[in-house]
Amino acid sequence: MMRVALVTGAGSGIGLAVSRKFLQTDVAVVGIGRDPAKLARLEALAAELGKPVATLAVDVTQDAAPAAAVALAIERFGRLDCLVNNAGVGSPKPVHETDDATLDQFLDLMLRAPFRLAREALRAFGPGSSIVNVASTYALVGGLRGGAYSAAKAGLLGLTSHMAAQYGSAGIRSNAVAPGVVPTDMTIHRLQDQGFRRMNDDMTPSDRRGTVEDVAEAVCFLASPAAGWINGQVLAVDGGWSSIKFLSEEALVAERLPVQPGWTHSGRARGDRGQPG
């Protein structure tokens, strides 16, 4: 019988790539997203491949969304085997520039919604089911800016670890991937910045930049029966960025420019050991 995966943020970026990989490997997809136009891409892809798909245009932070998403899977396919919590948002702001509304937005979308979706999916799961949470390398190591983002993604790793321990004895696995920065609608503005792009390249030992397809391969592997003895793990998909203290030869010999007076890129005035404000 065909396995069924529920994917959030399925209309673009990593979510669309994950959905494509599932369909290509004969896994039916229930795609969730806010934008019907983006979900239409997934529907067109499924039609092209001749594979089954169901979509639901809904904000996953809404109270009724988790139950509606799981109900759609059961109604259309009679089962649910995998949940991929992928929906996310990015913001390049450090903690002292992040207001409560932004903090709530990030925690609601990238921690509370995955928690509630997992809770609903677990009620429908049987042995052999799995959850794959899409976290970030910035949940593993510190980085500049993105305070709310890092906090939410790190919380997602904590949730992953708990669920692996709690539900492993029922044959339900929970794992996470931690992607580096790959080109998506959410990250394109950062990758267009020459300084960020060079920093990312100089700190990555692999010989190329990552893609959404790289992340999709990892997600779909962890969701598959082939990963049946993998539980509670975080797989960094970043070309070695997070685990190796690496600088390219060009960066090693580069001269560090002096910092100009005033605020630095870290958000603190040079020489100021007090609180930013």
Can you say where each PLM-predicted feature lies in the sequence?
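Conserved glycine-rich cofactor-binding loop
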Residues: G11-G13
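Conserved glycine-rich Rossmann-like NAD(P)H-binding loop of the short-chain dehydrogenase/reductase
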Residues: D26-R41
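Short, small/polar-rich loop/turn modules that mediate ligand/substrate recognition or access, typified
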Residues: V84, G168, R173, I230-G232
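Substrate-binding pocket helix/loop in short-chain dehydrogenase/reductase
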Residues: P94-V95, D99-L107, N200
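Active-site helix of classical SDR
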Residues: A118, A152, T160
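Alpha-helical segment proximal to the catalytic Tyr-Lys
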Residues: R123, A165-S169, G228
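Residue(s) in the substrate-gating loop at a strand-loop-helix junction
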Residues: S136
